């Protein structure tokens, strides 16, 4: 029998981890507490934050793994299609027989020569098994974080207080006055859905973010903003220049919020933040969504805002993020990684030098889709444990963790392209533009599609160049290798001493 690896969770992270570990000769065993695979994308009420009418805000090209494309031609996919895709992926790689459905993990602890995984299936069936290695792939989007607001527990509106995680449909809110707390993706998606279906909607927020439409000039926005150039620029140029470059892209694509009647965001995109939504700002401009400062107190059905104004509501829906929650880790592991509701000490979100044979997946918070970085993280784990790439230097790992600890208390949100290239470099599969002169523009300013990470390094594919050229040209985005004037100027900035 080969080296046994327990993978906790059979959502996107767990499935792609199993695929790449199996390719390296490991014997992965997935544990999934729900009765079906897919994680959040099952859409099960009370167990996931995905509601039936939800669509992705990332394109089909960047919401897929490298070995299996989506069926059809829709740019943005409904949640049910993502769930079907994950089932196809599991079948394609023969993973379904490796998944124990309806099995929850109650405890993970260190054993004499590996890791002990304690599980429960059914009402009274308990088990404990030893594995050589463990991948924790449950994700970080299970425990909604509703901020403390004085008097919130006394709210008397008939629709009550809930979170976007528990939202299922606009129907119960039809004709009601609804306050939506937050300005991130889920909050704005639900605010727009409610406004379209008969609710009187107010959004309350701490700060105004820039809002990037999902489509800009016919091209998905995640193809334009999450690029390799953005990472190279951040590494080589002054932060203010990168900030201005990204802000210009966002504002040119969708305007600035104050143009629609929303508050004026901070001039710095990094300080304000950015979110994706196609309809939110037009609905603000039409008066179908109103924007208020953050709420400061609640008394009965009445809410007081930061500017002293008050308004009564029938329901409140918070979309204010999640707490990191891994209750099955034993005390030793929790103490080693200093786990709290926000932070987890791990080198590049993955390994801890004092926990050999244990890896974490998908435990960071980012803007942009997770599929591409998750696959690259899975490859790094598989290549490291399989001996394809050198294991991380322990001294460097400790230094990286120390640097991370120094940033505790600061904003933790990162971006998809930064994370993807971090893992690609660690896995040895970052594409080298010098090897592909015919793809230079696409590799710099095009989408970080899964196909580009099969050009060079381990598991490179002979057809990857053609596949990536098609992905970059999709939606009419990059159909020639001639830089635009802005791209040429941006590229020359990187060449400056």
Task: Identify the meaning behind each predicted range.
Residues 7, 209-213, 357-497:
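C-terminal, flexible cofactor-proximal segment of oxidoreductases
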Residues 278-283, 294, 306, 310-325:
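Glycine-rich, aromatic-lined ligand/substrate-binding cores of catalytic
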Residues 2-4, 102, 174-175, 300:
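Phosphate-coordination loops involved in phosphoryl transfer and adenosine-cofactor binding
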Residues 6-37, 129, 134-282, 289-292, ...:
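Rossmann-like dinucleotide-binding core of oxidoreductases
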Residues 7, 12-96, 205-214:
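Beta1-alpha1 glycine-rich phosphate/pyrophosphate-binding loop at the start
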Residues 52, 177, 319-389:
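Glycine/threonine-rich phosphate-binding loop and adjacent beta-strand/alpha-helix elements that clamp
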């Amino acid at each position: 029998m080969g080296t046994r690896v327990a993978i906790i969770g059979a959502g996107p992270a767990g499935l792609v981890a199993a695929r790449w570990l199996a390719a390296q000769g490991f014997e992965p065993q997935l544990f999934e507490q729900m009765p079906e695979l897919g994680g959040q994308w099952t859409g099960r009420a009370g167990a996931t934050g995905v509601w039936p009418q939800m669509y992705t805000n990332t394109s089909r090209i960047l919401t897929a793994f490298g070995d299996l494309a989506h069926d059809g031609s829709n740019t943005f996919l409904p949640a049910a299609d993502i769930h079907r895709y994950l089932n196809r992926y599991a079948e394609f790689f023969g993973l379904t027989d490796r998944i124990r459905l309806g099995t929850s993990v109650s405890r993970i602890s260190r054993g004499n020569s590996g890791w002990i995984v304690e599980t429960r299936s059914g009402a009274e069936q308990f088990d404990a098994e030893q594995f050589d290695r463990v991948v924790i792939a449950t994700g970080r989007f299970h425990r909604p974080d509703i901020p403390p607001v004085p008097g919130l527990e006394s709210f008397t509106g008939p629709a009550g207080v809930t979170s976007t995680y528990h939202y299922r449909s606009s129907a119960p809110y039809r004709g009601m006055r609804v306050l939506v707390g937050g300005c991130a993706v889920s909050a704005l998606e639900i605010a727009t859905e409610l406004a379209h279906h008969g609710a009187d909607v107010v959004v309350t927020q701490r700060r105004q973010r820039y809002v990037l439409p999902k489509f800009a000039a016919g091209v998905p926005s995640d193809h334009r903003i999450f690029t390799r150039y953005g990472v190279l620029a951040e590494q080589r140029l002054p932060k203010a220049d990168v900030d201005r470059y990204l802000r210009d892209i966002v504002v040119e694509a969708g305007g600035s919020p104050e143009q629609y009647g929303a508050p004026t965001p901070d001039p710095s995109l990094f300080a304000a933040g950015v979110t994706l939504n196609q309809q939110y700002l037009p609905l603000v401009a039409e008066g179908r969504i109103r924007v208020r400062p953050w709420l400061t107190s609640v008394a009965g059905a009445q809410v007081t805002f930061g500017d002293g104004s008050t308004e009564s509501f029938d329901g409140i829906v918070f979309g204010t993020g999640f707490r990191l929650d891994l209750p099955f880790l034993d005390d030793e592991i929790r103490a080693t990684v200093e786990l709290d509701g926000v932070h987890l000490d791990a080198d590049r979100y993955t390994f801890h030098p004092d926990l050999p044979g244990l890896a974490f997946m998908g435990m960071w918070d980012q803007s942009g889709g997770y599929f591409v970085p998750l696959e690259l993280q899975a490859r790094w784990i598989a290549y490291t444990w399989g001996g394809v790439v050198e294991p991380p230097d322990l001294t460097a790992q400790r230094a990286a963790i120390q640097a991370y600890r120094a940033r505790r208390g600061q904003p933790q949100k990162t971006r998809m392209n930064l994370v993807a290239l971090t893992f690609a470099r660690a896995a040895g599969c970052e594409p080298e533009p010098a090897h592909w002169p015919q793809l230079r523009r696409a590799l710099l300013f095009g989408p970080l599609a899964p196909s580009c990470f099969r050009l060079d390094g381990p598991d490179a594919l002979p057809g990857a160049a053609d596949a990536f050229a098609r992905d970059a040209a999709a939606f009419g985005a990059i159909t020639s290798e001639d830089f635009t004037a802005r791209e040429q100027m941006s590229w020359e900035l990187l060449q400056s001493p």
